[in-house]
Amino acid sequence: MANNVVVLGTQWGDEGKGKIVDLLTEDAKYVVRYQGGHNAGHTLVIDGEKTVLHLIPSGILRNNVKCIIGNGVVLSPDALMKEMGPLEARGIPVRERLFLSEACPLILPYHIALDQAREIARGKKAIGTTGRGIGPAYEDKVARRGLRVGDLFDKEAFAEKLKEVMAYHNFQLEHYYNAEPVSYDEVLASVMAQADVLTAMVIDVTQELDDARKRGDKIMFEGAQGTLLDIDHGTYPYVTSSNTTAGGVAAGSGFGPRHLGYILGIAKAYCTRVGAGPFPTELDDAVGEHLGVKGNEFGATTGRKRRCGWFDAVAMRRAVQINSISGFCLTKLDVMDGLKEIKICTGYKTQDGKTLSVSPMAADAYENLELIYETMPGWSENTFGAKTLDALPQAALDYIARIEELTGVPIDIVSTGPDRNETIIKVHPYGE
């Protein structure tokens, strides 16, 4: 039985992680975010009520769960306060159940200004970031000039550090990007107004999680974005700025990697991507329109329309390698209802005739690839809300089985709708 479970995306994000984390946290004591920031968008539907979380772990909707934002997350005080408000208005005691690492880098207004100025400057070569300051905040962290949650304990020292780093960034904004500088006084006043709320939630995350492990408490690590957006292993440079893969758990939370027991990879029954970058199986036809409309494929964070395409087993095999996936959760199976035939990409062929069984990493390597497809019959039956395998048509069962064969990993969970109850659990990650 696994006590410590990782839930992460195996495609380009938006796979439906939030719902699955919420479902499985019925059995967990802790839910931990370990990377990313408020560029994530985790949508939960409980008894018909929709909640979108960007920064706070999805376990916050479970009364028995402690939620932790680990050191690998870049934290925007403004975004956190904005997210806490509606939850607290619903009677959820966020400040009693949410805890922060003092090592979380802060996202401040100058990071957002830089992010947006850079995207404008890139023009047609824009990465397609959310414009929320994620990348610049991670840059500051690596450059060792970033301000962290722990710096807020000494407000005078924080003010001096802020002045220094803002002089650096405002110089870039004014003289390189021809953009307006950010007001030091306004940033300082805003952060100081939030400082006491943030510092009151600080704990020693590594110690807390290790104590929980020793007690036998069940811990869930909630990934954001997806494997193919990983800063190192994704379609570089069209990637996010953090390690979205399983290897990011230990670095982003301080939890020992040897203690991770089960890694659940979330994958849609088809593929989507937001923003620029390679997307080999993308569909610009009626099928792509069907997937986008029926799947309501609009970003939870940006509202941007998602690009849609067939399931890519080649990319999925890469995700299996990187993450050592224990089992898959296949989401949005119901979106495939009504398609006469369904295709799965099983290989990429290069210009020199070589067949690739796993996807390349750099974006340039995707140019001029020929895709190898396998066609399967679709189904007309309605799978929405199915709760047992017996309720699925044979063609859907065959599709699930073929994905298992192509990836070498079992599909342990199938999601057939947005509500936590619209789920088929073949094997529970916690072994229950």
Swiss-Prot record:
Domain of life: Bacteria
UniProt cofactor(s): Mg(2+)
Catalysed reactions, as listed in the record: IMP + L-aspartate + GTP = N(6)-(1,2-dicarboxyethyl)-AMP + GDP + phosphate + 2 H(+)
Positions bound to substrate: 300-306
Subcellular location: Cytoplasm
Residues annotated to bind IMP: 14-17, 39-42, 130, 144, 225, 240, 304
Co-factor note (free text): Binds 1 Mg(2+) ion per subunit.
One GO biological process term: IMP metabolic process
UniProt keywords, alphabetically: Cytoplasm, GTP-binding, Ligase, Magnesium, Metal-binding, Nucleotide-binding, Purine biosynthesis
Pathways involved: Purine metabolism; AMP biosynthesis via de novo pathway; AMP from IMP: step 1/2
Residues noted as binding GTP in the record, renumbered to the chain: 13-19, 41-43, 306, 332-334, 415-417
InterPro entries assigned to the protein according to its UniProt record, in alphabetical order: Adenylosuccin_syn_GTP-bd, Adenylosuccin_syn_Lys_AS, Adenylosuccinate_synth_dom1, Adenylosuccinate_synth_dom2, Adenylosuccinate_synth_dom3, Adenylosuccinate_synthetase, P-loop_NTPase
Binding residues annotated for Mg(2+), in chain numbering: 14, 41
Keyword field contains Ligase: yes
EC number: 6.3.4.4
Job of this protein: Plays an important role in the de novo pathway of purine nucleotide biosynthesis. Catalyzes the first committed step in the biosynthesis of AMP from IMP.
Name listed for the protein in its UniProt record: Adenylosuccinate synthetase
